[in-house]
Amino acid sequence: MKRLILLIAGCFLIQLKPVKAQQDAQFSQYMFNGIYINPAYAGYREQLNVHAFYRNQWTGINGAPKTLSMAIDAIANDGNVGLALQVSSDRLGAQKNSSVYASYAYRVRMNEEGTSRLAFGIGAGVVQLGIDGAMLNPINPEREQPTGMQSSTVPDARAGVFFSNDRYYAGFSVDNLISQYINVDNYAFIPKPKPHYYLTAGTLLPLSTDILLKPSFLLKDDRGGPTSLDLNAFLIFGDKIWVGGSYRTAVKLYNKSYLQKDLNKLNSAVAAIQLFPNQNIRIGYAYDFSIGPLQGYSSGTHEISISYFFNNRKIRMLTPRYF
């Protein structure tokens, strides 16, 4: 039992890193809507759509992360501008964060048809960082430890670039550009945000007339904790059913001497499916299962998402949106 408590505490510390830094919420269905990691993705689908997801991580472990997010995005100016609004709430143990971001993307046409675009995006919003002191070491509290909920609201910004055509895509983005500089020293127990960098790319490979293969990757780094790599692959059947998964692990991208040498990678695998019952609705589900110390202690991670697309008859989409 003691070993389990130490293990869970260590996992939380890797994600939370109290006082000095805060890790962004983790989720597995970012490949279904890139707006969650890149503001330049706004307008990519070239139609008004609403997307929401809920993630219950490490089911069965008390205080494990839970994340709820909703986004809406659309195009303007003949498709040359993308607009998006995103609202998120994330809870991990005693930590609770909420955020609202508005994103703007300028989408440069790279060919006459407009099927190839290079987008530059920026997002601005506010983040509420909170900590429930009642959940922190209640037996032997520290002198400055809050007795109840303590929070601070700070401004923030994010930026990114996203390229796509009908065969492949690539993107780079960074968040927490402003909030990292806001002084929250008066609230010593509130984790301070720090920038997260996202690099992603993927391609589309036809296997037959009705089956496509979509491999992709996501590299995430915060210049503090371990660098995370996701390797993804999906089979697409007739544009209606997506079946695939991911493998997530830590990689040594560059030397981080401040990390302990025997830090466990906390590898995990993801099985996911995405369904399109009709042209307006998309439903997704992902199940993450740990490969490592948490295996056997957690019942896995469940994540569900849903989207609704408002079709505009005035706009003719030249190619389906796979990215």
Stretches found by the model and what they are:
Residues 1-4, 110-112:
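Positively charged n-region of N-terminal signal peptides that target proteins for export
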Residues 4-13:
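Sec-dependent N-terminal signal peptides
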Residues 13-14, 104:
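Short, flexible coil/linker elements and helix-boundary hinge sites characteristic
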Residues 16-21:
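Sec/Tat signal peptide C-region and signal peptidase I cleavage site
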Residues 22-323:
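Subset of outer-membrane beta-barrel
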